[in-house]
Amino acid sequence: SFLVSQGASSTGNELDDFFDFHCDAPSPSAINQQRDKLKPQVLEEVCHQLLLSLLKLDPPSPYRFLAADGSSFSFFSTPKLAPDEYFVSGGHSAKGFYSLHLNALYDLNSHTYMDAVIQPVHFKDEFKAFCTMVDRLETLEGTSDIFIADRGYCSYNNMAHVLEKKQFFLFRSKDVNVRGIAGHLPLPKQGSFDLCLDIVIKRSHSRKIAASGDYVTFVGAASTFDFLPYGSLDTYTLPVRVVRFPLDDGSYECIMTNLPADEFTMEDIKRLYFSRWGIETSFRRLKYTIGLSSFHSYKPEFIKQEIWAKLIAYNLTETVINHTVVETRKNTKHSYKVNFTEAAHICRVFFRLHSRKNPADVMPLLRRKLIPVRKERSFPRLQTAHFRRPRYFLYRAA
């Protein structure tokens, strides 16, 4: 449980806290030697098995809303310890830095990470990672999954992987007036609309192919489509619903989905897409509250260990919050929820089970750590780069 409960301080300070300042506590060097024997795949499997057990706690629901997105993490290393596939030479830093990319699937209802794929920065492939997570996701009996993602995930192959899983997708696409998937479809070029059509995919220019549909497109050898090999004389049909709605600033948003129109209206589609922002908030909490912006090693394999450990810590914290009964006075101006920052600290201490003779009673503590829910507040997204150089090991809070 040391990696799961580790904070942002130096490894030495974390060991002192974990072992209650015991003189016989292992040294940072000893911990690193033991970590060298541990493969990141072990912690990945622990994370997946934990999720399977947590799913049993949730009540059955007709739909599960899953947001997909990615975030990059930078760390210090040397050419001796990290291959070139992790090194970024220019751009944000004159000296260069090392980086990897986390692709994640996030449950917007339970606020937990359902799966993740970690890639070196130079082998970043969000399309491939998304398909991997969709294919291996454990489906729930009686529950349909809705995969929600921004326009960086809108591709024929991603849609097909979700359809083959017999689930639903909701992808933002480029607008109809911009070159992209929606821009090539036979759709109105202005105003709002909600239309269904069939996209027929072919991978050969042979005249033997009798393709008929609302829109027929050719996917070349340079593009990936896993359900129809290049040169095949067969076709693949994608039933798609395209929804275009106005925003407050007068612009329009275009959504591609396969959700049934009789069950999900245009307003429902709009609300579902904007709920995707939950995964952006979770990345901020994962980095700066759980402490994933402060790594404790130079080795990429150790960094992957810490990422999986922090995902475990995040999921456990959110699960404890979800099962905390919030009690407030009647007729309050706002509804209240548990403060995630306070909860993360309490749970981190609680995870150090072996070092606490009398572990804290977590639930009553969390009921005292409440903050108001102010849904009416909104803030403009920063237009500047969010890159932050990783912290040197010497510059850590005591």
Feature map (PLM): residue ranges:
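Conserved beta-strand elements of the Class I
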Residues: R64-L66
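Short Lys/Arg-enriched helix C-cap and helix-to-coil transition segments
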Residues: Q41-L54
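Short hydrophobic/aromatic segments of transmembrane alpha-helices and their interfaces
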Residues: E14, K56, M266-E267
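Long amphipathic N-terminal alpha/beta scaffold segment
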Residues: L55-P60, F75
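Single, function-defining residue in the core of a domain
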Residues: S1-S9, P26, A30-I31, R35-L38, ...
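Conserved mixed alpha/beta core segments that line enzyme active sites in large multi-domain catalysts
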Residues: Y86-G91
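A glycine- and small-aliphatic-rich helix-loop capping segment at beta-alpha/alpha-beta transitions
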Residues: L81-E85
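Short, charged amphipathic recognition helices of the HTH superfamily
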Residues: G7-F21
